[in-house]
Every structure is written in C-alpha cells, then in structure tokens.
C-alpha cells in the first residue's frame, strides 16, 4: 500500500510541473538576439558580447580557440579590429527546453570590417548560440 501511495504522489507531483508557452519563450529569445545585435551596433562588439554573456560563458573562435568567462570575452573583442567592425545576424531556428530554462539558436551572420587602409571585408557564416534563463528572468548566452 505504501508503494501505491508513493507512486500516486510521484505522478501527481510530476504532473503539476508548470507548462510553458514555448512560442512565447521563442519570441523572448528572438527579442534577446535582436537586443544583443543592437547593443553590438550601438555600444561596440566587446560591450555587447560582455553584456549578454553568462558569467561562465564560452565562445569558440578561430582554430578551435575557446575563450572562457565574460571578462575574457570582453578582452577578446576589445581590440582595433573589432572596434572597426560591425556584425549583423538573425536566428533562422530557435528551440526551447521543455522547462523553459535553456534555448538554442542558429542562423547566418555577417561581419564587416575595415583594415588599416580603409578597405572593407565581409565574413559570412553560421552561428550557434546556447541561451540560459537567469534568476532575474533575462537570457544570457553560455555558448557562442
């Protein structure tokens, strides 16, 4: 009988888990991506990548280099190349965990940069970002 009540209690407890509106959360993530992009345009790439990073965020860059932690990410982008560059992107796909605590996006990006001679170069690619919901209900990336 104890087993029956334990199973019954467990089923009730698990069925009471709050349901999330995944479409609403996907819109939150899309809006976060656009706010991130806007901050990079208005306040600089270093500040944008710093502000939207979780404290333990990791970014993977050239030659499989990992930059770990938001301070190191800011330092990575705080140089003349990125100060003279701009970046645009938009998620083509967004998915959200069943409990609404994590999400990921991918899509196309375009970096535009000027060299010392003033010549402009463009770099295109595909990004993949993993987002984590914070205790204040904002989203920060943990992987980019």
Question: How would you label these PLM feature ranges?
Answer:
Residues 1-25:
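Bacterial Sec-dependent N-terminal signal peptides
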Residues 101-111, 125:
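A short hydrophobic beta-strand element
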Residues 111-115, 131-133:
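Beta-strand elements of well-folded, non-transmembrane domains
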């Amino acid at each position: 009988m104890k087993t029956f009540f334990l199973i019954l209690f467990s089923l009730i407890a698990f069925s009471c888990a709050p349901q999330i509106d995944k479409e609403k959360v996907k819109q939150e993530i899309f809006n976060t991506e656009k706010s991130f992009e806007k901050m990079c345009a208005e306040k600089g790439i270093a500040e944008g990548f710093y502000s939207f990073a979780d404290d333990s965020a990791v970014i993977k860059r050239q030659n499989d280099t990992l930059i770990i932690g938001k301070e190191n990410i800011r330092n990575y982008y705080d140089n003349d190349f990125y100060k003279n560059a701009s970046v645009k992107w938009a998620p083509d796909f967004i998915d959200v965990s069943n409990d609404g605590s994590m999400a990921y996006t991918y899509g196309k990006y375009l970096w535009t940069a000027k060299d010392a001679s003033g010549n402009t170069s463009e770099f295109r690619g595909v990004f993949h970002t993993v987002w984590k919901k914070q205790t204040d209900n904002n989203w920060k990336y943990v992987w980019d």
